[in-house]
């Protein structure tokens, strides 16, 4: 379970491939979000079910704005771990910390730690304009390895800023946008369509929600997709209010249907 906690990126970039093989259309223009998409001091908790069985739990917390090298920044932390029967089979946890530029909504740095049955994998990324320097160390690596990626004029996000971009996007029905996301050492292209509004049931009661349908693709550093890899599909519901809280995410994978539900929110 790699970062199984977070709206589009959660299901788009984790788990098994969805059973569809269609190739993506040309990337939609990635216009900036209307707002930052993060609220200082907010916290969220989620449960993840696989084929109806509890498989994971996750938490996310947003800090208060501060200053770093003359820029206003905000820190976002998240943690996901196996739970229930899944935890009896394998203990996996994934922690990530992002420093985000408040003005642009872009990531400045990312630190992550994955522990899989006691084996640790670390990864960090430093973002500057259209480039990123990624350092990682797997359990089998004697020392950390570093690679530099150049994306030109394309804006690249981490999981936290991708979530924020979606929350801050005030779209009209049928609108499509493309977001590129770094997850570990891998680059993903995520295409999201604003599908409309509906009322859904949740652990917090019936809520009016806005719905997004998405597809994610493994991408190369030149932003083209790896054509031999099938697309992954997912649906995201955000609360239809000023908070735009992720209420629910669903996806169909070869492992079964994945459902992530919000269980607690405060700000």
Give, region by region, the residue ranges found by the protein language model.
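Low-complexity, intrinsically disordered regions enriched in charged/polar residues
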Residues: 4, 156-160, 194
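Active-site/ligand-binding surface loops and adjacent short beta/alpha elements
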Residues: 130-185
